[in-house]
Design a protein with these regions (language model features):
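Conserved short internal alpha-helix adjacent to the catalytic or cofactor-binding core
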Residues: 1-78, 194-333
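Conserved helicase NTPase motor core
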Residues: 107-204, 240
Length: 333
């Protein structure tokens, strides 16, 4: 049995929907995040989001100039709101196998050397605190891990359906796994990603062509599939409206048009400029046709609106509180 790795849950659902009609044993399919958790082992315990947050705050407290020079407050509630900037920056460095020293050597960041030195201190403090407390997380794992060979031995091959781009860590990991297990990389080329793909170490030897679907065995360095596909000559309709209400009406009309043309409703996607536009769409979606991927904020729920109205009424100066201990007895009568 093969293990198939996908970049999104939607791809996994599509894979099972396509294969469920076949009377055969299906390959296992998992998300890339789950695969990384299973295939990379550490001698430490994985830090929870709360533990990581507290350790990052402690690392920041050890850096005296962080708040003064970078304006990042280490006061807990302010830090709770802004810590994501630090985590995302350090995670990007970790996944791309880069150090802050590499950035300092780049002319583009020359004017920010003092800021980078402060961030470097915070980063080193954080990694040291993780190790001191026997923790690891997404920032430290790429620097120190071992392959879970028992997990890999459960499958005859690993097939990764690449959608998008690989981080340097993922690229190195696939190369490492390909030395002990058959690894197949499946991807499609286009004018947007061909140059990037040709720079990957394990694809440099291949003469990749544009608009082609490839399946390449990284272990044997051979092409298993090379299939040219035709790009769709898509026609775009561009409209502009001054009012959001008119934009919503246009969206609903286009959805109806697509359905009448025979397009399956589940294959229609509405991409919004921001989440606020979804609020307008909900008002126009009287028949509940739309499934909002972002979910519904609790502030928009009927329960919250009623509770908010009660709270505002109770907070009003004209609110009169009457203690009626026998209320339930009166209602039963």
């Amino acid at each position: 049995m093969k293990l198939r790795i996908f970049s999104s849950s939607r791809q996994i659902r599509e894979y099972y929907n396509q294969k469920k009609q076949q009377n055969a044993l299906l390959d296992s399919a998992i998300h890339i995040g789950e695969f990384l958790d299973k295939v990379c082992l550490s001698n430490f315990h994985k830090a929870s989001s709360y533990e990581s947050l507290l350790l990052m705050q402690e690392a920041c407290l050890k850096s005296k100039d962080l708040e003064k020079k970078l304006g990042i407050s280490v006061e807990f509630f302010a830090f709770l709101k802004n810590n994501e900037y630090l985590f995302s920056f350090f995670k990007e460095l970790s996944l791309e196998k880069k150090s802050i020293e590499d950035l300092k050597n780049n002319d583009y960041y020359a004017t920010y050397n003092e800021h980078l030195e402060i961030l470097d201190e915070v980063y080193k403090n954080y990694l040291a605190l993780l190790e001191k407390n026997s923790f690891y997380d997404d920032l430290s794992l790429p620097k120190n891990y071992t392959l879970n060979k028992d997990f890999l031995d459960e499958y005859e091959a690993i097939v990764y359906d690449l959608q998008g781009f690989l981080s340097k860590f993922e690229e190195n990991l696939l190369s490492e796994i390909s030395q002990i297990k058959e690894v197949v990389l499946s991807f499609k080329t286009s004018k947007f990603n061909l140059e990037y793909l040709l720079k990957l170490d394990f694809l440099k030897i291949f003469d990749l062509k544009i608009n082609t679907h490839y399946e390449i065995n990284l272990s044997k360095q051979e092409i298993l599939k090379e299939e040219i596909f035709k790009t769709k000559n898509s026609k775009m309709k561009l409209k502009s409206f001054e009012l959001r209400a008119l934009q919503c009406a246009f969206v609903m009309d286009e959805i109806s048009h697509f359905v009448r043309k025979g397009l399956k409703p589940e294959n229609i996607a509405v991409i919004t400029p921001d989440e606020s536009f979804c609020e307008f769409l909900r008002l126009f979606d009287k028949d509940n046709m739309l499934n909002f991927a972002s979910g519904i904020s609790i502030k928009e729920s009927l329960f919250y609106q009623k509770f908010q109205a009660l709270y505002e009424s109770a907070s009003s100066a004209s609110f009169i509180y009457k203690n009626q201990e026998d209320y339930f007895e009166d209602t039963q009568m």
